C-alpha cells in the first residue's frame, strides 16, 4: 500500500475508513492562518484539489471553505468569489459562528439566533446567485461545521496563550455553561432546523 495506508494498518486499522465527506481547508480567509489565501487563490486551489479527489473517488462529498465568521471584511464576497471556481466540484460551503454575552445583556443574547438566521439566508442567497450566474443545475448546501456559545473562558485562554504558551495540553476552551446559554443553544438549533432544507450538516464546536 501507500505510506499512509501502511501507517493505518500498523495502528490496528486494517481496512480503509471509507470517509466520504471532506472539507477543503479551514478558515482560509483568516490572516492568523499560516497559508491564508485570497478568495481567488483559494478558489483555484480548492477547485483543482476537488477535481483530483473526485478522480480517486467520485462518490465523496466536498465542502468549500467559507468565511471564518460574519465579521470578516470579505464576507460574503469570499463565498461568491470562491464558489465561482469551486461550484462545479463541491457540494457544500462551510459556515462558522460563535455567540456570547460578555456584557451580560440577556435580551440581546437571547435574540442572537436572529443573527444566525440572517447569516444562513445570506449564504444561501450567495450560493444561489452563483448557481444562477453559472446556469447550474445543483444547489450548494450548507455545512455549519463550527457553532456554539463561546465566551466564558476567553480571558483565561488569552492569559494562558500570552503568559504560558509552551504548556503541554493546557486547559483551553473550557467554558462553564449556564441555563441562559442552554436557552440560546436551543434557539440556535431551532434556527438550523428551520433551514434544514439547505443546512444539511452542523457540528457543535
Model regions and ranges:
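N-terminal catalytic cores of secreted or lumenal carbohydrate-active enzymes
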Residues: 1-100, 104-105, 117, 121, ...
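Short secondary-structure boundary/capping segments
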Residues: 38-40, 77-83, 109-111, 157-164, ...
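Generic recognition of stable, solvent-exposed alpha-helical segments in well-folded globular domains
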Residues: 41-44, 48, 77, 88, ...
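A structural signal for short coil/turn segments at secondary-structure junctions
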Residues: 57, 86, 135, 196-197
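Extended catalytic-interface subdomain
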Residues: 88-159, 188
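Aromatic/acidic polysaccharide-binding cleft in carbohydrate-active enzymes
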Residues: 137-205
Amino acid at each position: 500500500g501507500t505510506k499512509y495506508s501502511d501507517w493505518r494498518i500498523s495502528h490496528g486499522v486494517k481496512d480503509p475508513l471509507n470517509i466520504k465527506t471532506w472539507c477543503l481547508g479551514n478558515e482560509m480567509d483568516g490572516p492568523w492562518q499560516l497559508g491564508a489565501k485570497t478568495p481567488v487563490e483559494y478558489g483555484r486551489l480548492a477547485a483543482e484539489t476537488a477535481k483530483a479527489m473526485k478522480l480517486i473517488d467520485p462518490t465523496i462529498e466536498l465542502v468549500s471553505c467559507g468565511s471564518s465568521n460574519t465579521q470578516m471584511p470579505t464576507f460574503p464576497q469570499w463565498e461568491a468569489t470562491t464558489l465561482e471556481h469551486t461550484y462545479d466540484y463541491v457540494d457544500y460551503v462551510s459556515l462558522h459562528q460563535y455567540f456570547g454575552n460578555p456584557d451580560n445583556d440577556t435580551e440581546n443574547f437571547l435574540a442572537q439566533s436572529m443573527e444566525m438566521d440572517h447569516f444562513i439566508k445570506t449564504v444561501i442567497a450567495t450560493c444561489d446567485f452563483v448557481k444562477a450566474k453559472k446556469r447550474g443545475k445543483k444547489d450548494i448546501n450548507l455545512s455549519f461545521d463550527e457553532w456554539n456559545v463561546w465566551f466564558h473562558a476567553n480571558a483565561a485562554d488569552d492569559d494562558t496563550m500570552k503568559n504560558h504558551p509552551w504548556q503541554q495540553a493546557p486547559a483551553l476552551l473550557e467554558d462553564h455553561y449556564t441555563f441562559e446559554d442552554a436557552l440560546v443553544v436551543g434557539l440556535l438549533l431551532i434556527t438550523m432546523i428551520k433551514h434544514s432544507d439547505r443546512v444539511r450538516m452542523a457540528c457543535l464546536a
